[in-house]
Amino acid sequence: MFAKAFRVKSNTAIKGSDRRKLRADVTTAFPTLGTDQVSELVPGKEELNIVKLYAHKGDAVTVYVSGGNPILFELEKNLYPTVYTLWSYPDLLPTFTTWPLVLEKLVGGADLMLPGLVMPPAGLPQVQKGDLCAISLVGNRAPVAIGVAAMSTAEMLTSGLKGRGFSVLHTYQDHLWRSGNKSSPPSIAPLALDSADLSEEKGSVQMDSTLQGDMRHMTLEGEEENGEVHQAREDKSLSEAPEDTSTRGLNQDSTDSKTLQEQMDELLQQCFLHALKCRVKKADLPLLTSTFLGSHMFSCCPEGRQLDIKKSSYKKLSKFLQQMQQEQIIQVKELSKGVESIVAVDWKHPRITSFVIPEPSPTSQTIQEGSREQPYHPPDIKPLYCVPASMTLLFQESGHKKGSFLEGSEVRTIVINYAKKNDLVDADNKNLVRLDPILCDCILEKNEQHTVMKLPWDSLLTRCLEKLQPAYQVTLPGQEPIVKKGRICPIDITLAQRASNKKVTVVRNLEAYGLDPYSVAAILQQRCQASTTVNPAPGAKDSLQVQIQGNQVHHLGWLLLEEYQLPRKHIQGLEKALKPGKKK
């Protein structure tokens, strides 16, 4: 379901009543969880968000996010745990085991075929058709996928372990997993006999090189089953088989690498130094600490990683900046009550001068179907002029008719050629043009018809352009040009009051510039650390607006001007940004 990128509709903090309902739903859906475990999974006071999204096939899914990780998702009123949750509660669902080579196929969207199952010494778990199950890999009990059983255990055995076993909904490494902290499965020892007993166990499980080759051809449902998995029949046991590289790869991060907190501390330091060295200038000071985080540090986060201060040892931005101030890299002051700003930076500090800027990579700005996301490039916007009926006589000699679209330079050339061809240039003063009946009808007002006989070149051209209808052409990268009458509407940024006197930022007309409102909302939600929603724009057909909690005009302006490189003339409302020292 999440093999391809999804589209976020909204991301909001959960209400108290919804939190209580979610707890009740979790208790009903997963009766094996105790009261303490339910409270741990759905905390009472910690931040919990509801993300509504559309999967790539159009399914409406509700995802519950806690601590930056998706913990549960709801589809057609059924509640499912994510792999992040299953790693904390590995026995929550009946678990079936498969080979590490199969994982790549599952991540790509394949269902799990029964030949891919590994038969444990104790036999397969007992399930009925439609039961929710977990899927783990040989050597590690941490689930890497969840799916719905396509048949009961008895039917699986009767079929000789052939056919489709599980409809896979979610996997480790899919796009739902990527929306979290992207941690690897923990190493959880299998509930099995020790290696000595396994070697004596009749029918012990193993996989030879031929079988590994077959597994690489495992197919989707409906295709020929080239990748059937059988238990090997040689004398060697699993304990004697060489360690599978796929299994090693899955567990290596959690055992050998640094802890997630240490990794986040390093990422925080990297983004901090990168922002000071490349983005912040002396003229930007004093700089709100919230702006420094949202507009500068987040922009320096490497592609594929997510900066989350709550997962660092500092927990809060203010605590981290205090540490940087103690190291005399920056100076932070409270210029107004409750609002801190960076007022000074020591750009000669050894940590800044010695910092090596990471290899730049284009920031993925659009969320598209498929695993490859494309960077945003601003469109080429060109003003045009449309020939109205009243100007047809002037332009028909050059082959143009009513409704023709022309550039300003083309209009100039046509008017000059018309004047020269009809010998209208004044003989005594080359800067003047005599007006013939066609020019009089096209560019003069009625009260000027008998009084104005000549016009300077610049006045003639200006009047001509004013009489033409405005139009424009938008060319998005890789697409055919789009030509429309009228003037292109600017991206409109406004502030509005909502319930409880809360202020929100609303932005409209993003689509005209090739921007996906859902993508922009997702980026702003991360940058501003505020809830965002996408709704139909009032009074505009087939147009959406993005709403962000609080005054986020500064963050929005930085995104549009600095990162998307859109011209300022196409954006209105930037003056509504918070001034340094003012409260939100």
Swiss-Prot record:
User: Polar residues: which segments have biased composition?
Assistant: 247-257
**What is a single molecular function from GO for this protein?**
RNA binding
Cell compartments where the protein resides: Cytoplasm
Q: Name one GO cellular component term.
A: cytoplasm
Q: Where in the sequence is N-acetylmethionine found?
A: M1
GO terms under biological process: formation of translation preinitiation complex; intracellular protein transport; IRES-dependent viral translational initiation; ribosome disassembly
Q: Where is the SUI1 domain?
A: 491-564
Q: Where is the composition biased (Basic and acidic residues)?
A: 227-238
Region called Disordered, residue ranges: 223-257
Q: Does the keyword Phosphoprotein apply?
A: yes
Where are the Phosphoserine residues found in this chain? S237, S254, S361
Question: Where does the PUA domain start and stop, copy by copy?
Answer: 93-173
Name of the protein in its database record = Eukaryotic translation initiation factor 2D
- Gene responsible for this protein: EIF2D
